[in-house]
């Protein structure tokens, strides 16, 4: 993960394929790593997180679409468990 002071987990449920792909590209461009089909994790400053949230707010989400951004502390991240060997990995620690 990039240098910074805040780890974030972003998960989303978006019905429109093109918008879902666009959100994934935005998150990748911001330096987050995909850990599931609709979940990304990364490290960023508070300002970068605010900027990311503003960019995501500007997307034309449908009435049932949702994006959640969770701050995660190092202690909680270290307690992470991965069960199975799905297509996506955890990304850099």
UniProtKB/Swiss-Prot annotation:
* Annotated GO MF terms: metal ion binding; RNA endonuclease activity
State the CDD domains in the record. Cas2_I_II_III
**GO annotation (BP), single:** defense response to virus
Output the PANTHER family linked to this UniProt entry.
Answer: CRISPR-ASSOCIATED ENDORIBONUCLEASE CAS2 (PTHR34405), CRISPR-ASSOCIATED ENDORIBONUCLEASE CAS2 3 (PTHR34405:SF3)
Q: What is its EC number?
A: 3.1.-.-
Q: Where does Mg(2+) bind?
A: 13
Q: Which organism is it from?
A: Korarchaeum cryptofilum (strain OPF8)
Gene name in the database record: cas2
UniProt keywords, alphabetically: Antiviral defense, Endonuclease, Hydrolase, Magnesium, Metal-binding, Nuclease
Q: What is this protein called?
A: CRISPR-associated endoribonuclease Cas2
Return the HAMAP family for the record. Cas2 (MF_01471)
What are the required cofactors?
Mg(2+)
